UniProtKB/Swiss-Prot annotation:
It catalyses: (S)-ureidoglycolate = urea + glyoxylate. Homodimer. Pathway: Nitrogen metabolism; (S)-allantoin degradation. Belongs to the ureidoglycolate lyase family. Its cofactor is Ni(2+). Disulfide bonds: none annotated. It is an enzyme of class 4 (lyase). This is Ureidoglycolate lyase. Keywords: Lyase, Purine metabolism. One of its GO terms (molecular function) is ureidoglycolate hydrolase activity. Its EC number is 4.3.2.3. InterPro entries: RmlC_Cupin_sf, UAH_cupin, Ureidogly_lyase, Ureidogly_lyase_bac, Ureidoglycolate_lyase_dom_sf.
Length: 167
């Protein structure tokens, strides 16, 4: 099994998979009579159909035991999905390019600094939320509508990957 190298989460490195949601280096302007700075259009919510709706949820995720064997990835073919950390804890992101199935050799891993969120583009393969230190809360923006919006792919044993944030 291949051990994934964990990269720092940057807009440039993550661009093939979606948006990094962060204030550093983002467009902004003052509103509310100069008392509030708006960081504008940090990500775009994607939906497949006009009748689909963007919804906001909170996911409470328990920390996973590490190192972790990455056995599966999922994708959302009908809409984007954003995860914004609410408690400021670093978390991991595992992704693979859009395609009929994820290719084990193209899987990449990133570490958020806890102030960065991610918005997975439609169809991007990704691991479910990966909290590493303790229970964490995430604001999640995704799609509600008809149709199956979650495909799962399980790797054969020889294509499984190891994720070790402490290495």
């Amino acid at each position: 099994m291949r051990t994934l190298m964990i990269e720092p989460l940057t807009k440039e490195a993550f661009a093939p998979f979606g948006d990094v949601i962060e204030t550093d280096g983002s467009d902004h302007f003052m509103i509310n009579n100069g008392s509030t700075m708006r960081f504008h259009k940090l990500a775009t919510v994607e939906t497949a159909e006009p009748e689909d709706k963007a919804i906001i949820s909170i996911f409470r995720a328990d920390a996973l035991e590490m190192p972790l064997t990455v056995r599966m990835l999922e994708r959302h073919p009908l809409g984007s999905q954003a995860f914004i950390p609410l408690l400021g804890n670093p978390f991991l992101i595992v992704v693979a390019p859009v395609g009929d199935a994820p290719v084990s050799g193209l899987v990449r891993a990133f570490r958020s600094n806890g102030r960065q969120g991610v918005n997975y583009h439609r169809g991007v393969w990704h691991h479910p939320v990966l909290t590493i230190e303790k229970r964490d809360d995430f604001l999640v923006v995704d799609r509600s509508g008809s149709g199956n919006n979650c495909d799962e792919h399980y790797f054969p044993e020889e294509q499984m990957l190891i994720l070790n944030p402490h290495q």
